[in-house]
Amino acid sequence: MSTTDTIVAQATPPGRGGVGILRVSGRAASEVAHAVLGKLPKPRYADYLPFKDVDGSTLDQGIALYFPGPNSFTGEDVLELQGHGGPVILDLLLKRILALPGLRIARPGEFSERAFLNDKLDLAQAEAIADLIDASSEQAARSAVNSLQGAFSARIHQLVEALTHLRIYVEAAIDFPDEEIDFLSDGKIEGQLNGVMADLEQVRTEARQGSLLREGMKVVIAGRPNAGKSSLLNALAGREAAIVTDIAGTTRDVLREHIHIDGMPLHIIDTAGLREANDEVERIGIERAWNEIEQADRVLFMVDGTTTDATEPAAIWPEFMARLPATLPITVVRNKADITGETLGLTKVNGHSLIRLSARTGEGIDLLRDHLKQSMGFTSNTEGGFLARRPHLQALETAARHLIQGHEQLVSAYAGELLAEELRLAQQSLSEITGEFSSDDLLGRIFSSFCIGK
């Protein structure tokens, strides 16, 4: 991981556009300016200049911006050239810059990586840049901006600071056991620990919301042929995404639709009807259906209400329930309520959710949308929220587990040394979110998923 050479990349998307931007970062940025512009622009002022080739001919003309380090995005000297967005022009300008000594193409995410390494961003803020670019809804974008501005990092730093303060008390109790006041047994440390655990649980709740905003919920519609699975997909999507006929086995492959329910991304997957396959193509489709089911966050078990009065999943189709992963949440959807005359609504049957609706007429679909949102614990229009990734949730869970174990050591045995170690491990897990304890390999994987010009 070299940060001594100077990097260049296109910061705007590939293809034609009104404006195309090349970004340069590193110690040779000023040399690039002199070579291409004939001068070094005044720092942080827009300068309209021709962009020159090696022979002095004009390649393009546009705006040049120069940001001397450390007062730049990366913390290094940065030069931005904003010209016309034609791919040929940008390619010629890029080749011109790369012909200079010490210049190379940036790796994906390397600008953000350098900003992180130069303490311009912490890891959570750097990841928020990619999340903002990838945001699929207004609420996700707003939460990504909050993360970029440090909302998530600030919550983590507060927890780390509280743990540091708590560790001081614990270490003092260990090092000075003969003092008049025993911090381990007088309840003070336990009270502070309970407070940190409560704060951490609140951050975990908000982080789960942020993870849902970023990654969404994967819902698989499964059931026998002709149960109305494709009709339900179309009803949820609000368009004719799947072919619907009265012929059993019309859907032969996996169909995917991406929608939003009050800001929560929902990945709906329609699958082939589950039965004994009639041919090789259908067999492959059914295998793919089971693969999707096993990876789902929730399964909508589609039942044709005209074929059975049963409401208990195991009574409807015991073989299907036997093959489902035991921990996989399911919602039984009794379809065709417009024909059976069943009352629309959501009920519980032996711990499983059951909803009666009509995918054909759309009756009960709004109820299903609300159910999906509530089943994931999603709250829309959360003010001041932040985005979170699965590794963030894992780090928060690990920290919570260490605090629980430390609390057990404290209340059962006043074991200061064991409590101190659990507090240290919890603090380390939290610091991984902001990058203070991240390995180079982990950082490489994170930043390689970014855009080239970021």
Curated annotation (Swiss-Prot):
**What is the purpose of this protein?**
Exhibits a very high intrinsic GTPase hydrolysis rate. Involved in the addition of a carboxymethylaminomethyl (cmnm) group at the wobble position (U34) of certain tRNAs, forming tRNA-cmnm(5)s(2)U34.
Q: Please, which domain of life does this record's source organism belong to?
A: Bacteria
Which keywords, in A-to-Z order, does the entry hold?
Cytoplasm, GTP-binding, Hydrolase, Magnesium, Metal-binding, Nucleotide-binding, Potassium, tRNA processing
Listed GO biological process terms? tRNA methylation; tRNA wobble uridine modification
> Which EC main class describes this enzyme?
hydrolase
Q: Where does K(+) bind?
A: N226, T245, I247, T250
Cofactor binding note: Binds 1 potassium ion per subunit.
Query: What is the protein name given in its UniProt record?
Result: tRNA modification GTPase MnmE
Q: How does it assemble?
A: Homodimer. Heterotetramer of two MnmE and two MnmG subunits.
- Domain TrmE-type G residues, every copy: 216-377
Q: Name the HAMAP family on file.
A: GTPase_MnmE (MF_00379)
Native species:
Yersinia pestis
